[in-house]
Amino acid sequence: MPGPPRSLEMGLLTFRDVAIEFSLEEWQHLDIAQQNLYRNVMLENYRNLAFLGIAVSKPDLITCLEQGKEPWNMKRHEMVDEPPGMCPHFAQDLWPEQGMEDSFQKAILRRYGKYGHENLQLRKGCKSVDEYKVNKEGYNGLNQCFTTAQSKVFQCDKYLKVFYKFLNSNRPKIRHTEKKSFKCKKRVKLFCMLSHKTQHKSIYHREKSYKCKECGKTFNWSSTLTNHRKIYTEEKPYKCEEYNKSPKQLSTLTTHEIIHAGEKLYKCEECGEAFNRSSNLTTHKIIHTGEKPYKCEECGKAFIWSSTLTEHKKIHTRKKPYKCEECGKAFIWSSTLTRHKRMHTGEKPYKCEECGKAFSQSSTLTTHKIIHTGEKRYKCLECGKAFKQLSTLTTHKIIHVGEKLYKCEECGKGFNRSSNLTTHKIIHTGEKPYKCEECGKAFIWSSTLTKHKRIHTREKPYKCEECGKAFIWSSTLTRHKRMHTGEKPYKCEECGKSFSQSSTLTTHKIIHTGEKPYKCEECGKAFNWSSTLTKHKIIHTEEKPYKCEKCGKAFKQSSILTNHKRIHTGEKPYKCEECGKSFNRSSTFTKHKVIHTGVKPYKCEECGKAFFWSSTLTKHKRIHTGEQPYKWEKFGKAFNRSSHLTTDKITHWREILQV
């Protein structure tokens, strides 16, 4: 049998000693994460050798790996032929599966078989370090395991590192059966291998000789400096095939690819929630303890994580170090600037797989996804109402408390939402920074300008699936849909009457208070609502701005014109499901529905007679009071109903025509 190669006799370690090749068949048995880990380990080994001054020239294998090529297609003569010094106490449970072990055995035996198999078998019988008497004689015992030459110990350690990391790449935690026997005197830290101890000690003895020219920061290892430099060069050599994202480090790419695989290896024992990163699980666990060890000295607010406290402190300093080069706006946090920049670029990197809609923020996508599931998991214990988002439930709860925490310093008005207060404050400044290029009209908010622009473009993106009618705004479509469903979510606590719109409920509530804050300066008449006053004012001007293009008839109110147009079109959009009768006005339809219920809620206190509609009760009461509000001043006549006045006028004109 030939003796060991010269390099091992001399105690020198070369890159050939720590390189492993794979055949095409073996390489294809590895998944992407394992292939990437192989690349990472081989490149790291080469950098370590380069640091020690052992690697003089760059091997072709390293060039191949750096370029992202497959290592199995390397020429045979370019690969190495020296056998490694294998560590015999390779614990049995380090092998994840038999097939993987066989692949490694084949790869090693194929290369080093000529040196004899007895030194190459991966010995799995070692259940503990005691079997190999590693602890019996300390350093000497360990050398029996690794070989006597220090270079071989280093070499064995490197090989162990390759296999150890490779075989456990799919495990959340690495387990090792050996006792950690060797203690560093400077720190109570235990190691399984002597080479680890040697490497650990070098942290104390080695000067930080690798210095960054850009910022002056120094490092122990050249590999750390190389990774650090990527911050300035923006070099991102590793690209994800699934999503066009390029991390700066291969390990980051491996972690990133787990996201696409959907694999969540790290599970919380407390609540069962799973994560694809161990760091995320560690962070999550603190939630269950409720501990908030990081306290702000300025305001006393406590936080779970130190990073959150650091970010919070910026609020007190009012420093805004992150500035937008496009518009000059500054922000406290870099993440806010990143999101802000997307407003300028129009970038929407977060796409919904269900409908294809894209968003500029991941949180908005998360919120959007709930639309497809329809899940409402956040329930109010007070009234039983459920919500899709926790923030909406939190906001809703304030309704029950009636508390308005957010107060305007300018006018003292209170709000139950901070966003409402922020919106309100702009009213006091009078600033309208968002201007329409088409008509010059300015707006307080950009969202209002966006909606306004649709008037010029005549774009109606929101379409009703029920009847096909399209609308400029989503809110209008939402209200329109209630016409089909009959939903009336806004209920009056005073009388129990329900409404399809919140504004209608607000308007209705004034009836109970009797308040009439809107007064006509012309005649002194007061009204419950500003819209009614606006309509009333037209009486004094006799202005009829709303004209029918079909017949030329003019009206004082746009709503009356809308109802009038249906006479020409014959449209009757309001259909009764009970009897099938259709109506061209919603008010007429509402009155009609009461007939089917048989309920007559409006009762006369004078005689006890009941009516379907309040208007009929009002007319009836005039019988008891004798009130006659409809007057014909020309003849001194008065009537208790407008229809009676109209009938009398017609009779009068007929008499004149007959004469």
UniProtKB/Swiss-Prot annotation:
Q: Where is the KRAB domain?
A: 13-84
Q: Which GO terms describe its molecular function?
A: DNA-binding transcription factor activity, RNA polymerase II-specific; RNA polymerase II cis-regulatory region sequence-specific DNA binding; zinc ion binding
UniProt xrefs under Gene3D superfamilies: 6.10.140.140, Classic Zinc Finger
Highest taxon listed in the record's lineage: Eukaryota
Compartment(s) of residence: Nucleus
- Keywords, in A-Z order: DNA-binding, Metal-binding, Nucleus, Repeat, Transcription, Transcription regulation, Zinc, Zinc-finger
Q: Which InterPro entries does the UniProt entry name for this protein?
A: Ikaros_C2H2-ZF (IPR050589), KRAB (IPR001909), KRAB_dom_sf (IPR036051), Znf_C2H2_sf (IPR036236), Znf_C2H2_type (IPR013087)
Pfam families hit by this protein: KRAB, zf-C2H2, zf-H2C2_2
Question: Does the UniProt entry include the keyword Electron transport?
Answer: no
GO BP term (any one): regulation of transcription by RNA polymerase II
Zinc finger (C2H2-type) in chain: 210-232, 238-260, 266-288, 294-316, 322-344, 350-372, 378-400, 406-428, 434-456, 462-484, 490-512, 518-540, 546-568, 574-596, 602-624
Gene Ontology CC terms: nucleus
State the similarity comment: Belongs to the krueppel C2H2-type zinc-finger protein family.
**Reported function:** May be involved in transcriptional regulation.
Q: PANTHER family of this UniProt entry?
A: ZINC FINGER PROTEIN, ZINC FINGER PROTEIN 501
Q: What name goes with this protein?
A: Zinc finger protein 254
Organism, by scientific name, is Homo sapiens (Human)
Q: Which gene encodes it?
A: ZNF254
